[in-house]
């Protein structure tokens, strides 16, 4: 690893790591927790169950201490909506409220700053049954939940409303890996995204109206799309993909409306798939009021895509095994994902392309100059790892170190070019339950033996600990 370029970080730059409630907590039937959409779906359809997952519900103190001991200054985590409100229209669960206070206080005790998401892919089952984000009545339910958390957990100073809007909508209504498992329903996917942007805007307005101390934003998983070559049709396909996956969300967040260019290309995709979405009267006024009140911009980045024009039947193959070459994506009028020679991929077919992160950061600076401070709250790579033989053995995950270092280098390079990015969070703190892959897809800085729940240190954790400060 002697060729690594990142050996130190700016003194004021925040280095953190991340988790999500349903992927780490376990304890899915403990202390009055309600039922979310995954509890039902996984029980009926999956060989993998998220209990005990990483047992964070009981081991949070150990995991937060590990983060602090290895130089991590912040932890992104989420609150389980159905722990706080087992019945989304009912009363708050005191046991859950006390639990999350203990978690946040543990963070502060260890000098680890909590960054907290309200919704991380885990809608209540009752919300799913009533249309999830397609039903605007559920926006009101979300605002009630957000208001309670903003006012209750005053020790939290960094709030995220919704995590990865497009990833959620695409998983539910395009690829079908997430409940309700619909396929290529473009109307539903885009409508859900718009409604989530509206819900986010209303939550931001609520945050400021309540006079809450701290910062608030939402999290977008941004994936740049590059034409596979210089042919005009592939350039246009990459443009449409970018509007669908990135620009639609960025416009809605930072402008509070969708630009003419965004709507033109989005409507091309929708019309080709006999789809549409509705912007109701008053939506854009709310979004415009909220846009300048976002006090941080939060993005996740894992990969970029290389695009070729595609006109035909919609098809997607999802790689759930980690055997390379099993994934594919073809969406009429949007494009086809293709591999570019020389660009490495993970075992799950994700392109490893740090330049895409740099390009996206520069683009945000140039196209949305009004953006607030940026935090990159997920970046990391999955590996297939096995339990070490010795109790104190260190797991060699040099590939992860290389991945993190390459992307962190691009973040620091973007800072040098004037991008106001002040933090980088590694996904993930410990190995976790994966929504669609179960337990063989390991992202953690710390290995979890799921049978005993023992934590083993990986080399990546030691590399992070060894980073110096300028």
UniProtKB/Swiss-Prot annotation:
From the UniProt record, list the reaction(s) this protein catalyses. Answer: a 6-phospho-beta-D-galactoside + H2O = D-galactose 6-phosphate + an alcohol
GO cellular component labels:
cytosol
Q: Name one GO molecular function term.
A: beta-glucosidase activity
Residues at the active site: 164, 378
Positions of D-galactose 6-phosphate binding:
23, 120, 163-164, 300, 434-435, 441, 443
Q: Which Pfam families match?
A: Glyco_hydro_1 (PF00232)
Q: Report what the protein is called.
A: 6-phospho-beta-galactosidase 1
Source organism (scientific name): Streptococcus pneumoniae (strain ATCC BAA-255 / R6)
């Amino acid at each position: 690893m002697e060729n690594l370029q990142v050996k130190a970080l700016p003194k004021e730059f925040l280095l953190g790591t991340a988790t999500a409630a349903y992927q780490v907590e376990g304890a899915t039937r403990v202390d009055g927790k309600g039922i979310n959409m995954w509890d039902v779906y996984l029980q009926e359809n999956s060989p993998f169950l998220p209990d005990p997952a990483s047992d964070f519900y009981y081991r949070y103190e150990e995991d937060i201490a590990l983060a602090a001991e290895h130089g991590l200054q912040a932890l992104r985590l989420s609150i389980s909506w159905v722990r706080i409100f087992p019945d989304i229209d009912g009363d708050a669960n005191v046991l859950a409220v006390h639990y999350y206070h203990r978690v946040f206080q543990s963070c502060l005790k260890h000098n680890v700053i909590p960054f907290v998401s309200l919704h991380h892919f885990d809608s209540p089952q009752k919300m799913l049954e009533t249309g999830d984000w397609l039903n605007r009545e559920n926006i009101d339910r979300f605002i009630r939940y957000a208001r309670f958390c903003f006012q209750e957990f005053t020790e939290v100073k960094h709030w995220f409303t919704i995590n990865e809007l497009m990833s959620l909508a695409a998983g539910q209504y395009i690829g079908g890996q997430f409940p309700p498992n619909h396929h290529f329903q473009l109307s539903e996917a885009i409508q859900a995204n718009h409604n989530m942007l509206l819900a986010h805007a209303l939550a931001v307005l609520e945050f400021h109206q309540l006079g809450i101390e701290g910062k608030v934003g939402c999290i977008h998983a941004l994936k740049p799309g590059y034409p596979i070559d210089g042919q005009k049709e592939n350039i246009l396909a990459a443009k449409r993909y970018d509007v669908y996956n990135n620009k639609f969300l960025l416009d809605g967040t930072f402008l509070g409306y969708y630009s003419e260019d965004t709507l033109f290309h989005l409507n091309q995709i929708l019309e080709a798939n006999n789809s549409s979405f509705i912007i109701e009267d008053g939506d854009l006024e709310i979004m415009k009021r909220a846009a300048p009140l976002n006090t941080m911009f939060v993005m996740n980045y894992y990969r970029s895509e290389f695009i070729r024009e595609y006109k035909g039947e919609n098809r997607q193959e999802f790689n759930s095994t980690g055997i390379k070459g099993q994934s594919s994506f073809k969406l009429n009028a949007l494009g086809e994902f293709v591999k570019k020679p020389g660009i490495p991929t993970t075992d799950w077919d994700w392109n490893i392309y740090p330049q895409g992160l740099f390009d996206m950061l520069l683009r945000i600076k140039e196209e949305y100059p009004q953006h607030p401070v940026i935090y990159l709250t997920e970046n990391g790579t999955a590996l297939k790892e096995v339990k070490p033989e010795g109790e104190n053995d260190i797991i060699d995950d040099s590939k992860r170190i290389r991945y993190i270092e390459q992307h962190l280098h691009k973040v620091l390079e973007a800072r040098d070019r004037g991008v106001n990015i002040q933090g980088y969070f590694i996904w993930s703190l410990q190995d976790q339950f994966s929504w669609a892959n179960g337990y063989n897809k390991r992202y953690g800085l710390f290995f979890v033996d799921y049978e005993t729940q023992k934590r083993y240190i990986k080399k990546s954790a030691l590399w992070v600990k060894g980073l110096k400060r300028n």
